[in-house]
Every structure is written in C-alpha cells, then in structure tokens.
Amino acid sequence: MVSTTVHLLRHGEVYNPDGLLYGRLPGYRLSDRGQAMAKIVADHLTSTGRDVTHVVASPLQRAQETAAPVAQGFGVELATDDRVIEADNRFEGLVVAGPGGGALKNPRNWPYMWNPFRPSWGEPYTAQVERMRAAVEDARRAAEGHEIVLVSHQLPIWLTRRALEGGTLWHDPRNRQCNLASLTSLHFEDDKFVGLHYTEPAAELYDGASKVAGA
C-alpha cells in the first residue's frame, strides 16, 4: 500500500489596506506579515522532515508568493494550476461589511443574495469542489508515495475538506477552520482518502492579522 499526502496550504496575509474582498483581482501581494508566514510554513515543512517532491500554486500573486519559499526550501520547481484558484465572486473589489454597511447592505446587491446554498453571488460550491478534487487527484498521482503542497485559498480548501468529510457545502463563513498559512493535510493510501489533519504553523503571527478573506 502506497501512502501519499497532499498538503493544502492557504496563502499568508494579503496587503489589503482598503479591506476589499479581493477575489481574483490581480496585484494583491502578501503583506510583510504574510511573507513572514510563508517563510515560517516553509521552515516548518523542511524542519519536520516532510518528503515534499512537488509544489503547486494558484496563479494569483498571493499564492505564488506563499509557495515560493516552500519550493525553494525543498529545491523543487514551482508549478501553477488554475484549478486551485480563488472562488469567483460578484462582490469582488467591494467592501463586503464594515462601519458603513458594506455591499451586503446595499439594496442593489440583494438580488445576488437569494440563495446562500449555491451560492447565488458567486461560483457554485459544487464547481469549486469539482475542480479542487481534480487537482488533488492529479497531485496525488504526481507525488505518489511522497508529499505535495498545493497553495490555494480559504474557501476552495474549506469546501474540499467538507466534501471529503461528508459535510454540507453550505456553511457559516465565520466557522471555517482554514486560517492564514494553515495546512490542511490530506492522507491517502493508494487512491483512497483515509483522513486529514489541520495545523497552523504561523499561529504566532495571527494576533493583529487581517480577517478579510478573498471570497
């Protein structure tokens, strides 16, 4: 029986002084804190003797910057996979909530909010799971018998976890267990998913970090 681990790594903190829901918008880089988070995760993986043979990231800048020190630490080339990109969202580029009310309290946006189970304001949860599961399966095959790191985003990672654990895809975003620079590590025996564990190597930097998610 061949054991393989696919680590789903969420990117570090993003420089986002306006508090926008940045989604797939270009140019959203890691903050200084986010860069430190990426370095901590890379050091964590290398120092604990992980057998990482591949590192793959979403095409978005924040994911690429998070993946770079991990790839460097293991001496492997950084690859890109569009299937692990952030979720599409109609509120991209807007302040979703805040002192002024945000996009959710603007009546012009209410027609997009009629179905929280799909959801009606963005990429269907099922579509996100489908593309992520395909990327995970290809990653498992590529790194069979070893470990691979996929750098993605909070919502796609969380939905993948819920699907694997048999949970509903609709959820309260405040209850997502997928913090900045966290690892959701999926374990496989041959092609069978056998469990996961969740770790936060950069937790020491969470105090004062931005709470705004990308989607």
Segment roles from a protein language model:
Residues 48-51, 139-146:
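Glycine-rich phosphate-binding loop signature in dinucleotide/nucleotide-binding domains
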Residues 44, 73, 138, 142, ...:
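Active-site catalytic microenvironments for nucleophilic, acid-base chemistry
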Residues 3-4, 9-79:
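Active-site-proximal alpha-helix that buttresses catalytic centers in soluble enzyme cores
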Residues 106-127:
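Short glycine/proline- and acidic residue-enriched helix-loop micro-motifs
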Residues 6, 146-154:
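Generic beta-sheet signal
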Residues 15, 62-64, 86-88, 156-158:
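Short, active-site-adjacent cap segments at secondary-structure transitions
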Residues 57-60, 83, 151-155:
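Short, well-ordered beta-to-alpha junction loops that form the rim of enzyme active sites
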Residues 1-4, 76-80, 86-100, 146, ...:
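Acidic, low-complexity terminal tails and accessory targeting/binding regions
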